[in-house]
Amino acid sequence: MYIEMIDETGQVSQEIMEQTLDLLNFAAQKTGKEEKEMSVTFVTNERSHELNLEYRDTDRPTDVISLEYKPETPILFSQEDLAADPSLAEMMAEFDAYIGELFISIDKAREQSQEYGHSFEREMGFLAVHGFLHINGYDHYTLEEEKEMFTLQEEILTAYGLTRQ
């Protein structure tokens, strides 16, 4: 999986960047998404607040914002078009590969790791996997959806070795 990592805060250690990259690749393998692309941006609470207001109309910072990429209009080309211009097939594959972007608030991750009594590394991993599952179509609006998503989330984190202890 190709993952673009951006640290807008200047506060994310190389270890956390590498853990996030490794964990998301692990999650991609577990969910059959190895051929996909996404981005992860680490932000402050202030930036998280702005994004939450812009995309979710919620006037407060949040821990992770998941923006699933869904093309509004499918790009369709005829076989003649594809034969005449092979770059069209490459372009279609690129659009199909990109699944979305995550914005993880470093400030919220620190607050929540203390609140829940586990490591910052575990909280960062939790937020990355939680957001990853959202941009892959998982949600928790109903009890059934919540059970499915949270079970898979915990399975991934446990198999990776990021437990709550």
Curated annotation (Swiss-Prot):
Taxonomy, superkingdom: Bacteria
Root EC class: hydrolase
GO biological process, one term: rRNA processing
An annotated GO cellular component: cytoplasm
Keyword Electron transport among record annotations: no
Coiled-coil positions: none
Chief location category: cytoplasm
One GO MF term attached to the UniProt entry: zinc ion binding
Binding site for Zn(2+): H130, H134, H140
Protein's name in the database: Endoribonuclease YbeY
Organism, as annotated: Streptococcus pyogenes serotype M1
Lineage: Bacteria, Bacillati, Bacillota, Bacilli, Lactobacillales
